[in-house]
């Protein structure tokens, strides 16, 4: 992730664009970098807690993250084309998927709250927080992508 970020930043600094555009692109690059960092943090925590298999409820959260990622990727691929409205639709899909992710998070947390195994509750809560943070960062990146589209019009 660091190498990709460095390459992208070098391209950005050498591009002939307005400062506003450069700021928007920089924001997206740093947000993508923060997503990679959040994923790394999730993996570090899962490894530290020796977690190899997660509760079934996590599958729904991972699916929501995948939906966010696919919609964001699709939006970026359409950036700079004549499909601005599709990019806006993709960014809304990211926000909708994140909202659904938060709902899944609450359902799992409510179920965990009924458990007497505090170590299990703590571990799963920490992992869930990391996943929710990844989703939040994806949503922030989608908002910045939408900002770029609006500035391009």
Feature roles, as predicted:
Residues 2-153:
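Cytosolic, long alpha-helical scaffolding segments
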């Amino acid at each position: 992730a660091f190498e990709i970020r460095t390459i992208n930043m070098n391209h950005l600094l050498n591009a002939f664009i307005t400062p506003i555009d450069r700021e928007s692109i920089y924001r997206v690059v740093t947000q993508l970098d923060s997503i990679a960092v959040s994923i790394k943090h999730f993996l570090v925590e899962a490894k530290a807690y020796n977690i190899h298999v997660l509760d079934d409820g996590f599958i729904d959260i991972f699916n929501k993250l995948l939906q966010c990622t696919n919609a964001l990727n699709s939006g970026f691929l359409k950036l700079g084309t004549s499909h601005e409205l599709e990019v806006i639709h993709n960014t809304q899909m990211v926000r909708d998927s994140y909202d659904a992710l938060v709902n899944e998070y609450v359902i799992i947390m409510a179920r965990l709250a009924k458990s007497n195994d505090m170590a299990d509750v703590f571990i799963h809560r920490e992992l869930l927080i990391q996943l929710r943070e990844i989703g939040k960062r994806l949503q922030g990146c989608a908002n910045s992508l939408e900002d770029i589209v609006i500035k391009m019009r």
